[in-house]
Amino acid sequence: MSRLACISSLFILCAIGSEAVFTQSAGVKGVLMCGDKPLANTKVKLYDDDTGPDLDDLLAEGTTDSLGQFLLTGHTSEVMTIDPKLNIYHDCDDGLKPCQRRVTFNIPKSFVSSGENPKTFFNIGTINMQIEFESESRDCLHR
């Protein structure tokens, strides 16, 4: 019985320790424009892109400020290195079409940090969202 208790305790300690070891974070910042005007109050979300039946983990969300600027940071615990991505939901040059344009940018793994706070931020720079991105889609859920 004591052998089983030792093995169980060791398993629990390993499980608790693995959470701290594999906590990872990412951060992204940038400026969104619509032509020559800042794209203010635009929804931006930072996800860990998971494959398979596992849903993507929302790490952070926010909106751009009056100058079109945003900064997001988030963290999660995973066994493997996280795959951060930025989703932008906007109506720049969209006319009267329903829902919003959704554009996704994958963040390089070199910007993933261990721990809850990112050591570096991925700076996407200034992007004119008038561009029609090849991979963009429409989204009616994330206003």
Swiss-Prot record:
Q: Which InterPro entries match?
A: Transthyretin-like (IPR001534), Transthyretin-like_sf (IPR038479)
- Which residues constitute the signal peptide according to the record? 1-20
Gene3D superfamilies, alphabetized: 2.60.40.3330
Q: Say if the entry is tagged with keyword Magnesium.
A: no
Q: Which domain of life is it from?
A: Eukaryota
Compartment(s) where it occurs, according to its Swiss-Prot or TrEMBL record: Secreted
What GO cellular component entries does it have? Answer: cell surface; extracellular region
Substitution effect: L72F? In gk567379; increased sensitivity to the neurotoxin 6-hydroxydopamine (6-OHDA) during the first three larval stages resulting in the degeneration of dopaminergic head neurons
The main location is secreted
What name appears for this protein in its UniProt entry?
A: Transthyretin-like protein 33
Q: Which organism is it from?
A: Caenorhabditis elegans
Record lineage:
Eukaryota, Metazoa, Ecdysozoa, Nematoda, Chromadorea
